[in-house]
Structures are given as C-alpha cells and as structure tokens.
C-alpha cells in the first residue's frame, strides 16, 4: 500500500487537523478562481488570470487540451464553438490556428482575448507567485491525448512551477499516469455528484489513499461535514467545485473546506474576510 503523498501539503499550506487553523480552530479555506473567474471575465483567458491574481486568488484554475501540432492549450471544451469564434475540435487545429481565434465572453460576444498556451498561463502564475489547479481534459471523442502528461510536466519544470501546481483529472488513467511520472507531484482526483451516485465516497477515498493521492475535488453539492471528516481521516484534502451561490460558499467556508473553487472569486473573497 502506498502512503499518501505529502508533496502537496506545503503547496496548500493547510492544516487538516481541527484546532490548527484559524481562531475558530478550523482549517484555512483557500480561494481558487475557476477558469480565472468565468462569471467575471472571458473564461480561461489571460485577462481573467491576471485579474484573478490581482484580486488575490490563491489559485488560478484552468483546463488543458492538445493542439494538432502538440502544443498544450488552455481551454475548457474539447471543441471551439462555445468559447471562441472558431469551429471544430481543439485537437484538429494547430497552435497558430488556435491563436488566430478570439475568445467570447459569457454573453457570447467576441473579445480581443486569444486562446492561451499553457506556457503563457504558467508565466502569469509564476511571475505573480500564485499557485495553479490544472485540469487535464479528454478530447472530443472522450479519449486521452497521447503524451499530454509528459508535455504538462515539461512545461511545469521549465518554469519551476511543479511544486506550485495541483494536476487534476476526472479520468483515473490520467492522474495515475501523473503519479507514475512524478510521484512527488500533487495530483487531485475529481468526482461529480453523478459519479459518486455509482459508488461511495468512503470507497473512493480508500482507493485514493492507497494510490497516494492527497487531494480530491468534489462537486460542492456532496460536500458536507461528514464528507470532510471522512477525507481528513484518510489524510486527503478537499476542494469543492464550482461554488457560485453565496450561501453555499458560506456553508463550505464554515465547514472548513480546503479549497473553494468558484467563478466568482470576488464574492468568495468578501466572504473569506480578505
């Protein structure tokens, strides 16, 4: 049985034992700007990431796919229609073709923002001294991108940001591959409420603990005091996604969730008293 990796505890800067946190004896909740703050700025844009950093988010959260010529690109969907003025699959376009596109805002209006490369986004976080939640996605056919894990690691190493990054995935094969390539890297297994409807949180936490995974990202509707207690007992930190309702944010902060992942980092910042 593999022990839970301790690589990420310093990264999170969190105490999972009650009594070692703030004045109320609760762990400190960290703030992650989901897609840079998707309800405030064009999602997964350099503008969003720079603004999230300026706002004081602890983490910028984003998603990656591969271009046709093997560049790691920061974009949520495997296809281009929803968030850009382009069409088709990300994997069918070269980096030059993707960079020629423009991102849309949440109202669907085309902006001047381009699709960033992972290299560009890491540079923003590195220069600002911020941490990253990096989700590796599947392609439009629900297949893994060959070699994407190695490419992500190479870019993190180039910028010396591996120690400031949590690599996340819904697909177990992806986070397992990251663990194989870099056992000391902080990785996070993601679960939706629907996924947990086919199993139990306790069973999944035991699987993660045995695999040495120190973080779990849960859809916020399944995160309560019981779930947090189970995770802490397993030595696993919890991030809750994607929390945009102020009452839900407050509930999770009071419960002591490790990371609050939100499209509205401005609202979360106010509730955290920063």
Task: Describe each model-derived feature in a short phrase.
Residues 1-2:
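N-terminal secretory signal peptides that target proteins for export/translocation
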Residues 5-9, 15-274:
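Phosphate-group recognition and catalysis centered on beta-loop-alpha active-site segments
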């Amino acid at each position: 049985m593999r022990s839970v990796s301790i690589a990420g505890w310093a990264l999170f800067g969190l105490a999972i034992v009650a009594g070692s946190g703030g004045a109320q004896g609760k762990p400190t909740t960290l703030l992650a700007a989901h897609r840079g703050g998707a309800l405030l700025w064009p999602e997964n844009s350099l503008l969003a990431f720079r603004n999230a950093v300026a706002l004081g988010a602890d983490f910028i959260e984003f998603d990656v796919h591969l271009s046709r010529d093997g560049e790691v690109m920061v974009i949520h969907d495997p296809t281009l229609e929803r968030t850009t003025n382009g069409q088709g699959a990300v994997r069918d376009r070269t980096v030059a073709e993707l960079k020629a596109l423009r991102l849309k805002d949440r109202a669907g209006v085309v902006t001047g923002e381009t699709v960033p490369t992972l290299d560009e986004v890491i540079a923003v976080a590195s220069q600002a001294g911020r941490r990253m939640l990096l989700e590796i996605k599947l392609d439009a056919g629900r297949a893994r991108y060959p070699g994407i894990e190695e490419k992500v690691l190479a870019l993190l190493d180039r910028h010396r940001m591996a120690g400031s990054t949590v690599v996340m995935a819904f697909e177990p094969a992806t986070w397992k591959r990251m663990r194989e390539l870099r056992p000391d890297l902080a990785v996070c297994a993601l679960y939706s409420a629907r996924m947990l409807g086919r199993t139990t949180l306790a069973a999944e936490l035991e699987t993660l603990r045995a695999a040495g995974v120190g973080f779990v990202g849960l859809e916020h509707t399944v995160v309560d005091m019981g779930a947090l207690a189970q995770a802490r007992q397993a030595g696993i930190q919890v991030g809750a996604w994607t929390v945009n309702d102020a009452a839900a944010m407050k509930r999770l902060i009071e419960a002591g969730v490790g990371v609050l992942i939100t499209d509205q980092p401005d609202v979360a910042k106010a509730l955290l008293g920063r």
